[in-house]
Regions:
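Short helix-perturbing small/polar motifs within transmembrane alpha-helices
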Residues: 14, 21, 78-125
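Hydrophobic alpha-helical transmembrane segments
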Residues: 9-14, 39-40, 53-59, 85-90, ...
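Membrane-embedded alpha-helical hairpins and interfacial helices in multi-pass inner-membrane proteins
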Residues: 74, 107-179
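Structural signal for the C-terminal ends of transmembrane alpha-helices
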Residues: 47-48, 98-106, 168-172
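Hydrophobic transmembrane alpha-helices
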Residues: 1-54
Length: 179
């Protein structure tokens, strides 16, 4: 097995671990706490190739589904996927895929930022849909609760991911996987 093949198996697990660890960091701002889950998904997506990034986000969901306490605040279990926040989580693999496809070592910071914003937008679409259909909220309430409080924090997360990605990829450039 080649070194890159080994890495393509290890990196999704490492990415899922990063997402799980950062999901436990909760910033209690206002009525709705901010977590670093989307920051982690965006960072993993910006650094890894699309396949590994998508697998990392999917593995994270599988670990949570089987009951490991990897979701925000130590949550886990299959019931999470039937609650009002299910759409946010289920959008993570799509977030990872889109962001990873649009980001690479030579991507300018502003394009990395836009890639994060585009991928993160999919998370908000999923979240608003699940708040509406599973949480029985009206559309306006779902947007007010599930999007509005997160706009500025997520733009900041996207900016940080964009600023951090280039130096991280530069540091890893000597490894063939990251070329």
């Amino acid at each position: 097995m080649t070194q890159n093949r080994t890495l393509s198996l290890i990196l999704p697990a490492f990415g899922a671990a990063i997402i799980a660890a950062l999901a436990q960091i909760i910033i209690p701002i206002g009525a709705v706490p901010i977590t670093l889950q989307t920051f982690a998904v965006g960072l993993v997506a910006a650094v890894l190739k699309p396949r590994e990034a998508t697998l990392a986000a999917t593995l994270y969901l599988i670990l949570g589904a089987i009951g490991l306490p990897v979701f925000a605040g130590g949550g886990g279990g299959l019931q999470t996927f039937f609650g009002p926040s299910a759409g946010y989580l289920l959008a993570y693999p799509f977030f990872a895929l889109v962001t990873s496809v649009l980001t690479h070592a030579n991507t300018p910071i502003w394009k990395s930022f836009l890639a994060f914003v585009l991928g993160d937008s999919l998370v908000f679409v999923g979240g608003i849909l699940s708040l509406h259909f599973l949480g029985k909220m009206g559309w306006s309430a779902a947007v007010a609760v599930g999007l509005t409080p997160f706009i500025i924090p997520d733009l900041l997360k996207g900016l940080i991911v964009a600023l951090v990605t280039k130096p991280v990829l530069k540091a890893l450039k000597n490894h063939s996987y990251f070329n």
